[in-house]
Amino acid sequence: MAALTRNKKKGSNSQTPPLNKQTKASPLKKAAKTQKPPLKKQRKCISEKKPLKKPEVSTDEEEEEEENEQSDEGSESGSDLFSDGDEEGNNDSDDDDDDDDDDDDDDEDAEPLAEDFLDGSDNEEVTMGSDLDSDSGGSKLERKSRAIDRKRKKEVQDADDEFKMNIKEKPDEFQLPTQKELEEEARRPPDLPSLQMRIREIVRILSNFKDLKPKGDKHERNDYVGQLKADLSSYYGYNEFLIGTLIEMFPVVELMELIEAFEKKRPTSIRTNTLKTRRRDLADILLNRGVNLDPLSKWSKVGLIVYDSQVPIGATPEYLAGFYMLQSASSFLPVMALAPREKERVVDMAAAPGGKTTYVAALMKNTGIIYANEMKVPRLKSLSANLHRMGVTNTIVCNYDGRELTKVLGQSSVDRVLLDAPCSGTGVISKDESVKTSKSADDIKKFAHLQKQLILGAIDLVDANSKTGGYIVYSTCSVMIPENEAVIDYALKNRDVKLVPCGLDFGRPGFSSFREHRFHPSLEKTRRFYPHVHNMDGFFVAKLKKMSNAMQPSGNDEPAVTMEQAQVSSSDDDDEKAEAIEELEKPPVASGQPKRESNTKEDTNKRKNPRSKEIHKGKRNKNTKTESGNVEEPRKQKKKRSQWKNEIAQAREEKRKTMRENAKETPKHRG
């Protein structure tokens, strides 16, 4: 009963203040009721009242629960309290709308309002508190977001102002360095950032020299090209010959892309051995071992590209079992162009380490015969090991010079030949950076001479009458034109062959002209591959079809020469050269000694008719009979003296002069 009377007193007290306040309300305050209270002021008043009366609210709630259990009067008083709380909440919002001058009056009125407000339901208080907390948190986020927005706007404005200032200010035009500046640079260590900036400016100007050349600059295009050569040589480490050749082959913008691509490593690729497994099965196994890989490309059905691996890719159980071969993507191309068929006779003239040979064996399904030739003995070990590991059983390994294979296997004895010729390696600089400085013009000439001999030997091996074959594929890992297009053009002029499409859907066509050289128009059927375009090593591929077994093209005026006749003529020239050298090496005859009688009948016959020796031996007889039985007339040819013969003739003449002088001086000494 004590609790009941206490609540009744509180209820009566809570009802009186609103009545008094309504009577005392001024017309200004009534007008302010219709307006929305300021958000900041309302938050301030509520936050100040909340902590003062929290303990009283909890005790009143317990007493109200007891009243509800005992009688119905408690429920009526609770409803009155609930309604009073609503009225007082409205009055409290009215007080918040007062001006700053009436702060003291608001504080006095707030005390009874706070009691009545807190006597309300607990749910209302909790919701109000959560709203306050969310409002305070939201206000902080809003302030932060506004600050960030202001900062961004300021940065954008500053950037715009700076850009406008740069437009107004006239930029300094690029000028080539003078001779004095270049000499000073040579004395100092290389300044790589300044070199890079100069290279960019020169490339930009050379890309459109007519329009971008600085006004008033008297330098010509060659001056800019010369400076670019020097800067690229010092920045990337190339010798002047190699960088000069690349500048002549490519536009300057593409040249920079090529050089930058040479500085990056090519992705690792592997080839599935279809003799033992399938690409899908191999990929699943390697993925389970932690190898991140993907199919190589649409043009290859057996290639996989490896991004990274948790295990050494060249030491997995699958590698040792011969399920795949570590092989660059560019090495797939010559074999794909060769397209060998089953039960054919194929020659790989430079087979080590066996990547292409094992690919050919897989395409032939271990049928037919493959002659895997390698001239260098140390490389035969890796070739034989890979053949055994990959399960190849149709291959014969041989160790000959590629130029001598026709003597071993016979002329026109095979269906297809793959010649991946030794070259300068200018397409694989990313693997061997020593190529930048080690290769010179003489090296390119030596490689080109060897390649011309090898391709003629490869053509002579192929049988033009083969029902399924008669093809030769020539490839190099070089980008130099003398090693690629010039070699193919030489083969077209010296053998009865023609170029056919390589069967590759991508790649750039070869050069049909370069500098003063003009090649056969069909050289556009060859294919070039570059690292900056195809993301593989620089490579060249050409495919030839042998039309006849003649040694020279049918269109030439000179008759076709067989292999035996060519060997005889070369051996005869060697014999003549050896005889001339022996004669020069003979000691001069002393003046007191009698001269040897060398004017025999045989010697006189040799001097009168130097080809009598050849006719006597029967090696060369021009009056040969044709198939019809008629004797051909000897062909009149102009005598061409080679350089070594001229040197020998000069040496002989000098020797004769010295002998004459000695013969004239001898009688004077005797007298």
UniProtKB/Swiss-Prot annotation:
Q: Which InterPro entries match?
A: MeTrfase_RsmB-F_NOP2_cat, MeTrfase_RsmB-F_NOP2_dom, Nop2p, RCMT, RCMT_NOP2, RsmB/NOL1/NOP2-like_CS, SAM-dependent_MTases_sf
Segments of this protein annotated with the region Disordered: 1-188, 550-671
UniProt entry tagged with the keyword rRNA processing: yes
What processes does the entry annotate via GO biological process terms? RNA methylation; rRNA processing
Keyword tags? Methyltransferase, Nucleus, Ribosome biogenesis, RNA-binding, rRNA processing, S-adenosyl-L-methionine, Transferase
Q: Where is the composition biased (Basic residues)?
A: 1-11, 30-44
Q: Would you tell me the Gene Ontology cellular component terms?
A: nucleolus
Q: Where is this motif: Nuclear localization signal 3?
A: 594-601
Q: Where is this motif: Nuclear localization signal 4?
A: 639-646
Q: Which reaction does it catalyse?
A: a cytidine in rRNA + S-adenosyl-L-methionine = a 5-methylcytidine in rRNA + S-adenosyl-L-homocysteine + H(+)
State where composition is biased (Low complexity). Answer: 129-139
Kindly identify the residues recorded as the active site: 477 (nucleophile)
Which EC number(s) are documented for this chain? 2.1.1.-
Kindly state the positions of the motif Nuclear localization signal 1 in this protein.
28-35
Knockout phenotype, as recorded, reads: Normal levels of methylation at cytosine 2860 of 25S rRNA, but slight reduction of mitochondrial 26S rRNA cytosine 1586 (m5C1586).
Ranges of compositional bias, category Polar residues: 12-25
* Positions bound to S-adenosyl-L-methionine: 350-356, 374, 401, 420
Q: Which family does it belong to?
A: Belongs to the class I-like SAM-binding methyltransferase superfamily. RsmB/NOP family.
What is the stated purpose of this protein? Involved in ribosomal large subunit assembly. S-adenosyl-L-methionine-dependent methyltransferase that probably methylates the C(5) position of cytosine 1586 (m5C1586) in mitochondrial 26S rRNA. May play a role in the regulation of the cell cycle and the increased nucleolar activity that is associated with the cell proliferation. Seems involved in the regulation of cell proliferation.
Protein name, UniProt field? 26S rRNA (cytosine-C(5))-methyltransferase NOP2B
The encoding gene: NOP2B
